[in-house]
Amino acid sequence: MFSPSIENLVAQLTRLPGVGTRTAHRLAFHLLRAPKDEALELASALRDAKERVRFCSECGNWTEEETCEICRDVRRDRSVICVVEQPADVLSLERTHEYRGLYHVLGGALSPLDGVDPEDLRIDELLRRVEGDSVVEVVLATNPNTTGEATASFIADRLRDRVRVTRLASGLPVGGDLEYADEVTLGRALSGRREL
């Protein structure tokens, strides 16, 4: 129906989360109508991000440096580590302005049915951070769904005798993702976290 170039663009756009065929067509048509330099700037920004952005060597967040801005910030409370599944969760929690500790990004959640086991996540790195640093509390902020709860329980079992282990309070919808929660809900969940 359309040229192979348009069909390829639509196919690539549908690979993005939440983008179906109709939205992909709208985005493709918008990009084609836009001035050429705007489309090329978008392509350049995407290429730059893919080439420069990597994972922080300490926490697993996204960064262009060896360590991320949060890990380098001397004003952060280094006695508390908030464990999240993905770097996008760090951004969601930072928007609340309620948390001033450090983070640890697991890179996913335990899901044996999908082949995601403890060794596939950054759990060993978390255990080493807790042993090596002066950490007194670990806040488990995995998603409030089946895999997130299983991951939180698994980590809590390994940390319970070493540090205080807390979980975000209720208020987050079960089955939801942190990335899509609003700042007020996340702020309340952080403030009302509980011991496991």
Model-assigned labels for residue ranges:
Residues 1-17:
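Extended, structured, electrostatic nucleic-acid-contact surfaces
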Residues 2, 99-100, 127-196:
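Long C-terminal interaction/binding lobes of large macromolecular proteins
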Residues 49-52, 64:
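Short metal-coordination and nucleic-acid-contact micro-motifs, chiefly zinc-binding Cys/His arrays
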